[in-house]
Amino acid sequence: MTRLSVNINKIATIRNARGGNNPDLLKVALDCERFGAEGITIHPRPDERHIRYQDAYDLKKIVTTEFNIEGNPEGEFIALVENIKPDQVTLVPDAVNAITSNAGWDTITHQSFLTEIISNFKKAGIRVSVFVDPVTAMVEGAAKAGADRVELYTEPYATSFHSNKEAAIKEYIEAAAAAKSLGLGINAGHDLDLFNLNYLKKNIPFLDEVSIGHALICDALYYGLENTIQLYLRELKK
């Protein structure tokens, strides 16, 4: 079964736009779970422009499905994850000023760094996923560094899906097969939506988890949050 983890960063962005606590991030997280989401994902950044570090502590107290924290493993983020001990940490090499994640790790160049970080998180009992491009060598590097899972960066797939979905999925099938052969779990995320999700799942049937935020929240503006989550779950179960 492929789990749907809802990324609630966009909810925090809306909240922070006006100050105060509307929408209530914690209530939205609980409602996502109540509506069928099988996980909650957040991606705090150093400037706290959407998710605040305090949000992570507050969410840890109430999330009853899988809690996944994404981010660049530096300084305050490392301390945050070690203190909270989420079910999963996803290591993402995003720059401080990046609008959103735009590339996976070079797991060969950063092998020693990742090995140390992953070891420390695993000693704390946290499952570790490494965000990678769909390149077999990068998947192999993540396995060598000790990762439990890889998260395949799906923006290139989403961009090419409508023009040539067979070509768009090819390298993901290969990367996923490599991950499976190495004993890694497989997650996927970035620009997945109601149009391209089912094709990804059908071609990688052993996919463990997808984390979806931006498109899901955009769809919720039209369909409502409960209906939207059910629509995404339906795409994963077709």
Swiss-Prot record:
EC supergroup of this enzyme: transferase
Enzymatic reactions: 3-amino-2-oxopropyl phosphate + 1-deoxy-D-xylulose 5-phosphate = pyridoxine 5'-phosphate + phosphate + 2 H2O + H(+)
UniProt pathway: Cofactor biosynthesis; pyridoxine 5'-phosphate biosynthesis; pyridoxine 5'-phosphate from D-erythrose 4-phosphate: step 5/5
Active-site feature positions: H43 (proton acceptor), E70 (proton acceptor), H190 (proton donor)
UniProt-listed Enzyme Commission number(s): 2.6.99.2
Keywords on record: Cytoplasm, Pyridoxine biosynthesis, Transferase
GO biological process: pyridoxine biosynthetic process
Compartments where located: Cytoplasm
Pfam families: PdxJ (PF03740)
Similarity comment: family membership: Belongs to the PNP synthase family.
Role summary: Catalyzes the complicated ring closure reaction between the two acyclic compounds 1-deoxy-D-xylulose-5-phosphate (DXP) and 3-amino-2-oxopropyl phosphate (1-amino-acetone-3-phosphate or AAP) to form pyridoxine 5'-phosphate (PNP) and inorganic phosphate.
Record text on subunit structure and interactions: Homooctamer; tetramer of dimers.
Protein name stated in the entry: Pyridoxine 5'-phosphate synthase
Native source organism of the sequence: Cytophaga hutchinsonii (strain ATCC 33406 / DSM 1761 / CIP 103989 / NBRC 15051 / NCIMB 9469 / D465)
Source species taxonomy: Bacteria, Pseudomonadati, Bacteroidota, Cytophagia, Cytophagales
